[in-house]
Amino acid sequence: MSKKYSEENTSSIPLTDLTSPSTGETSSQQQRQRASQQQPPQQPESNTATGSRWSNFVDSFKPAIENEKLAMRYRDANADVEEDAGGYYNSTDQLTEIQRININSSKSNLKRKLKNRHLQMIAIASSIGSGLLIGTGGALATGGPGGILIAWILSGISILCTIQAMAELAVTFPVSGGFNVLFSRFIDPSVGFSVAWNYVLQYLVLLPLELVAASMTIQYWNTDINPDVWVIIFYVTVTSINFFGVRLYGEVEFILSSLKVIAVVGFIILSIVLAAGGAPNGVHHGTKYWHDPGAFANGFKGVSSTFITAAFSFAGTELTGLTSAEAENPRKALPKACKQVFWRILLFYVVSIILITFLVPYDNPRLLGASDVSASPFVIAIQDGGISGLASVMNSVILISVISVGSSSVYATSRTLVSLAEQNLAPKICGYVDRAGRPLVAILITNVFGLLSFIAASGKEDEVFTWLLSISGLSSIFTWLCICISHIRFRRALHVQGRNTDELTFVSQTGVIGSWFGILLNVLVLVAEFWLAIFPLGEKSNAKSFFETYLGFVILIIFYFGHKLWRNNWILFIRSRDIDIDSGRRETDLEALKRELQEEREVLRNKPFWYRAYHFWC
């Protein structure tokens, strides 16, 4: 890659390597002249001094002026050129379709308004939801305390490796759509198309599902009011959060995530007291439930089933990667946020689950007696401890969690739809971003799908959502698998093209080995899911059970081969030497970047050991 100016210092000046034959001016002089004559107009400034706030509000919904369209409008009428990653223009003959897509994704009109604290809290608490607070109950019942602990520890290590790989890619290429764009870049466009659309389907279904879950959670206190009344309240709340821009989303997530973290830490402290015999009923639990009824339930099949629940509970961990295009300083904030994943897995998942196995036996009938908050092992532990009132507190935490996940589902769906539109994999209208940086059309599409939540009072919601979830039920696993593959392919491309990790602002702490481990475990989870789809736990084999479990894989295959037929491209992988590792980078002057990184390493090397340890882990 040739030396270029950094993105922040680059102006839209057509590149020419020729000296003017008539004037003898150098190309740089010509560039300055053309820049002064053809400077594209900037975004309209706020007219609060001369206009009303209402007119400013209305204007904010108008389309943002796109950098690429401006460049095309103000460049030479006879020049057939494109802007490259560093802000230069080259002949279109020199750019592949993937390079054009990569550049387009890096020039998103989304606003960089997410601060470091927003990313920190999103990373820590983004996946603390019904999977951990309720889903662990069913996993404990089917796998036993030993099975659930093994599943969450191994899955946690896999997620840690995956997030490290994602951080390396997202910091290097902070593009709209995050990791979804990188699948087409490093693996194959058909893989990117199929996995990204499955990801969209997952979160399209998740929004109404979480709204229904919120209305059902309210029924813990009151069953007289029609659930659709609560659906309306939560629907308006969640949709409003995203319509007011990414900054409000970040603030709301920061508050809700803080409450979730405080609640889980409080439960951990309470559980230690209960396990030690400090409950009002005076019962000392210790590890007796590991001996009676035992450490494992339903043998190897039971343990395998807990891996699926563990994968579901970790869904949403990758959301940090989607924020790269809207982070104020992705180079600094994203690595720090992704490092927090280790502590979240250790504290909020592993420690919580260990304490749950001390307090609730796997044969407790309430674990499988319902699918709502009453099946939460957290609530059961509090109730069995003889503590009144705290069950309502935990129910409130579950309510906060489902609202948070619902809001995040709108964010994830809308940003992924924008990236698909930028890649020409979705209708162009889906990529509409207004002057406030809001992807309005994508948000509207997501909110329209959220109207499915009004079936909450129909009595058929369980059957409807079971089939809707089956369409994209494996989406998170496919996404994590492709993140790891993309990381390995990126490192391979660096090696083949004579480059190394010295030019990366963040390098995965688990490296390529961690990505291989992530691939291995995700493949094993898919195999376990297939086995349980054919031979379900506790019932006979049947087609309905199989498709409820594995329909997502069938949908993925249809999307994949459909895209292959559409593009008539039957190449399985982009060759390593052909992978584009330059377009869309935030830092494009590699020599200056290497010097800066070396200086940072020297400064860190001179710090005390405790500081270096803190920097590594936090």
Swiss-Prot record:
Glycan-linked positions: 9, 90, 104
Superkingdom of source: Eukaryota
Biological process terms in GO annotation: amino acid transmembrane transport
Keyword vocabulary terms for this entry: Amino-acid transport, Cell membrane, Glycoprotein, Membrane, Transmembrane, Transmembrane helix, Transport
Mode of membrane association: Multi-pass membrane protein
Family to which this protein belongs: Belongs to the amino acid-polyamine-organocation (APC) superfamily. YAT (TC 2.A.3.10) family.
The protein's name: Amino-acid permease GAP5
